[in-house]
Regions:
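N-terminal DNA-binding recognition helix of tyrosine site-specific recombinases/integrases
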Residues: 1, 9-20, 28-63, 111-113
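Short, charged phosphate-coordinating catalytic segments
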Residues: 48-59, 105-129, 223-228
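Catalytic-site neighborhood detector that most strongly recognizes the C-terminal catalytic loop/helix
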Residues: 78, 158, 178-179, 230-259
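C-terminal catalytic core of tyrosine-transesterase DNA break-rejoin enzymes
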Residues: 103, 107, 207-233
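Conserved tyrosine-mediated DNA breakage-rejoining catalytic core shared by Y-recombinases
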Residues: 117-160, 236
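Short, polar N-cap/turn motifs at the start of nucleic acid-interacting alpha helices
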Residues: 123-129, 201-202, 221-242
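Active-site/catalytic core of tyrosine-dependent DNA strand-transfer enzymes
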Residues: 154-201
Length: 259
């Protein structure tokens, strides 16, 4: 992103005007304000480290950059079911790891970073209920405590999981993940570019997560059970008691999405 915006320039020559141009470049690429903050935070940290190593005393030009708010969260739309089915079909026609990532998200509702940061061993195909064990890893944290969960594999997610396990790489999506980091920003840019011509305006890769919630509502699943599958935080006190929903129960609900 940075080199695209300002070129491959000497670190000491980067000024606040370059940082502002970089921000404008990210906005033009369609990134939400939260994503822009995340990218700028990473670049700022890299600049701090590199300037110390090289003895550059200039103030960090990426500090204090204004980032306008947007309405991306409220305007983000679910992907219609007919579009989901067409995309899933095309994913297996192309049949590469990037398309498997889309397919696995489309029928699990995982956040992009959750899926991109998986180990292949997190995929449990030989269990009584095929599922993904979603846990924190050193290279990828989880958003909330409720994000840690077991997700049944059905439909296109199951088909993608078979292919990932057959490849046998340590990381499910090695293009975006290694032992030091999970590059969800890079994955987001690439996948949204491919999806742009295939989904309605206002939809992005994260929209599959919104769609899953709507699809589970359509088969009359209780709200707290939907939260358990998607890793959303459930409001109220009652959800803190008991052991939650059994994986086999969640699997039966998820199988309804194949109809």
């Amino acid at each position: 992103y940075l080199i695209e915006s300002i070129g491959d320039v000497d670190l000491s020559s980067i000024k606040s005007v370059n940082a502002s141009r970089f921000r404008d470049h990210l906005i033009a690429k369609g990134l939400a304000s939260t994503s822009i903050r995340r990218v700028l935070s990473s670049v700022k940290a890299i600049y701090n480290l590199a300037s110390k190593e090289l003895g550059i005393a200039n103030p960090n030009p990426f500090s204090g950059i204004f980032i306008p708010e947007d309405n991306a969260a409220s305007e983000r739309l679910p992907v219609p079911l007919d579009a989901i089915r067409l995309i899933q079909h095309e994913c297996f026609q192309v049949d590469d790891p990037q398309r498997w990532l889309i397919a696995i998200i489309s029928d699990t509702g995982m956040r992009l970073s959750e899926a991109a940061g998986l180990l292949t061993e997190d995929i449990k195909l030989d269990a009584d209920v095929p599922h993904i064990t979603l846990r924190k890893h050193p290279w990828r944290s989880l958003k909330t405590a409720s994000s840690e969960r077991d997700i049944p594999l059905v439909g296109s997610a199951y088909e993608a999981a078979i292919r990932i396990v057959d490849v046998g790489h340590k990381y499910a999506f090695a293009r975006y993940c290694d032992e030091t980091k999970c590059n969800a920003n890079s994955a987001s840019a690439a996948l949204n570019k491919w999806l742009k011509q295939r989904i309605p305006e206002g939809c992005v890769i994260h929209s599959f997560r919104h769609s899953l919630r709507d699809r589970l509502r359509a088969v009359e699943r209780p709200s707290d059970s939907i939260d358990a599958i998607g890793g959303w935080t459930t409001a109220g006190i009652g959800h803190k008691y008991g052991s939650g929903y059994d994986l086999a129960v969640k699997y039966r609900w998820m199988k309804m999405l194949e109809r």
